[in-house]
Regions:
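Glycine-rich segments within core transmembrane alpha-helices of 12-TM secondary carriers
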Residues: 164-197, 204-211, 396-410
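Helix-breaking motifs and short loop linkers at transmembrane-helix boundaries and internal kinks
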Residues: 54, 70-71, 95, 103-104, ...
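Extracellular/periplasmic helix-loop-helix junction of adjacent transmembrane segments
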Residues: 59-91
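Helix-to-loop junctions at the C-terminal end of transmembrane segments
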Residues: 91-104, 318-332
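Conserved MFS/SLC helix-loop-helix module at the cytosolic interface between two early adjacent transmembrane helices
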Residues: 90-130
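Primarily marks hydrophobic transmembrane alpha-helices of the MFS/SLC 12-helix fold
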Residues: 109, 336-337
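Extracytoplasmic gate region of multi-pass secondary transporters
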Residues: 59-60, 259-325, 375, 379, ...
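Intracellular terminal tails of multi-pass secondary transporters
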Residues: 1-50, 56, 63-64, 219-253, ...
């Protein structure tokens, strides 16, 4: 279906034009998009923050006493418990995004949240490290579809140069809330002995209960795709669909087939986005799982290590939002990913090689700022350079799946025998940042070349099959 045919299929959609003065149209646009923002970003950010809390509280629980209780110090048990989560998390990313439209985003994502909340609650009652490992695997099953599903939904609502700010706010609000996981873990661990339950168990029980509560609420509040929404008026819905159609021509979902999925997976740039995402999530997961343990190894006590784990997340929010705003304003992605990658490298070098603990701690601030900012930047970079609902679904799922690979690497390269400095893990993380810079350069050169050939009329077909489309650098 051509872009013109798609527009004609909306009926009154094409009749919605700004008035002669334009003031009513501007007011209508602002009111509509403000409503979209308020109905999407806060609820998904809040729910995903608890997904992150439930995913990363393993390190805090171990610091609070779970390690000796479940004998996690024996061999590689802690790494096994950590890494098992990512196996179903990776495998189920693409299938989850392929069926999300079939079941409806709101119902499907609320079901996932209920599942992982129940598992998290159950983790508070495990008695052996084997049961803990089983719960971690189930956690990966239920969380697999949530993040790529939300990225898919957000990118369906906004134009290409609006999406990074929204992705940044969604992800960073979640990250900031989850950044208090160590403080919350410390507070919950103070319940040690209440009802004959260990302090580390209370961490899982309370956080799992809150997740279940939010999952019930989310069934009524989670957003769906634009054409299925219930909070906008018909004219507002048509307006949103129209602006997406004019921006990239994919407001109408294309039919999904096995042949089409395999065709999309043959695009090497989708795999490049995934590997780039893996590179920037590796340090994020390393900090999430090991920051309190690393700080304790630097000589701080349990309480201080847990409390000092939160401050590095504050400047990360400000930095990433600034780069997201600048990126959308200048309609440029790759250069800002490079800058934030260099910030990560600087922080890694300080943390790995400085002899002073305060400098190493300062390096964690820079590392967290760089990696946290790269995550929404890469998601926006990939979302801007695909056209079509089916390809957008595959791209977001594949990208986030590679984030799980970053989690596996982080879980295995930070080994018990390398405590307290974890130098081999830091070296691997540093190498991943250089790989990120290389792939950003490679995709930028490729997109520059394809844009030039398209402008010169030397291509047999329009880029991404969409006339007038050009890749975002």
């Amino acid at each position: 279906m051509s872009s013109l045919e798609k527009k004609e299929s909306f009926g009154s959609l094409v009749q919605l034009e700004p008035d002669s003065v334009g003031e009513k149209f501007i007011h209508f646009e602002r009111r509509t998009m403000r409503s979209v923002d308020l109905h999407i970003i806060p609820i998904v950010a809040l729910l995903y923050s608890f997904a992150l809390l439930d995913r990363i509280n393993l390190g805090a629980a171990r610091t609070a006493g779970m390690g000796p209780a479940l004998h996690l110090e024996v061999g590689a048990r802690f790494s096994i418990c950590t890494v098992i989560y990512f196996i179903p998390y990776i495998i189920l990313q693409i299938p989850g995004n392929l069926i999300i439209r079939k079941f409806g985003a709101r119902r499907y994502l609320a079901f996932c949240a209920t599942g992982w909340g129940a598992v998290q609650l159950g983790m508070g009652f495990v008695t052996t490290w084997g049961y803990l490992t089983l719960c971690r695997m189930l956690l990966g099953v239920f969380e697999a579809s949530f993040f790529p599903g939300i990225v898919y939904i957000i990118s369906s609502w906004y134009t290409r140069y609006e999406v990074q700010k929204r992705l940044a706010f969604f992800y960073l609000l979640s990250l900031t809330i989850s950044g208090f996981s160590s403080i919350l873990a410390y507070a919950f661990s103070l319940l040690d002995g209440k009802r004959n339950i260990a302090g580390w168990s209370w961490i899982f029980i309370i956080e799992g209960s809150v997740t279940l509560f939010l999952a019930v609420i989310s069934f009524f509040l989670l957003p769906d795709f634009p054409e299925l929404n219930t909070f906008l008026t018909p004219d507002q819905t048509q307006f949103v669909l129209r602006r997406v159609e004019e921006d990239r021509g994919d407001s109408v979902p294309d039919q999904l087939t096995v042949r089409k999925v395999l065709h999309h997976l043959g695009d090497w740039t989708l795999w490049a986005y995934g590997i780039m995402f893996m590179c920037c999530t590796l340090p994020a997961y390393a900090l999430a799982y090991f920051i309190s343990i690393i700080l304790k190894g630097l000589g701080w006590g349990t309480t201080t290590a847990l409390l000092l784990s939160t401050p590095p997340y504050a400047p990360a929010f400000a930095s990433a939002v600034f780069f997201a705003w600048l990126s959308d304003k200048t309609r440029h992605r790759a250069g800002y990913i490079l800058i934030q990658g260099l910030i990560s490298i600087t922080g890694l070098c300080l943390t790995a090689f400085s002899p002073q603990n305060n400098v190493r701690y300062a390096g964690i601030f820079l590392l967290n700022a760089g990696s946290s900012g790269c995550i929404p930047s890469i998601l926006a970079y990939s979302a801007n350079n695909v056209v079509g609902s089916s390809k957008r679904s595959i791209s977001s799922a594949l990208t986030v799946a590679f984030g799980g690979v970053g989690g596996i690497i982080a879980s295995t390269v930070y080994r018990e025998q390398d405590f307290p400095r974890y130098l081999p893990g830091l070296w691997v993380t540093l190498g991943a940042q250089f790989l990120l810079l290389f792939l950003v350069g490679a995709t930028s050169l490729h997109f520059t070349r394809m844009n030039r050939l398209s402008r010169e009329g030397k291509l047999a077909a329009p880029l991404e099959g969409q006339p007038g489309f050009f890749y975002t650098l």
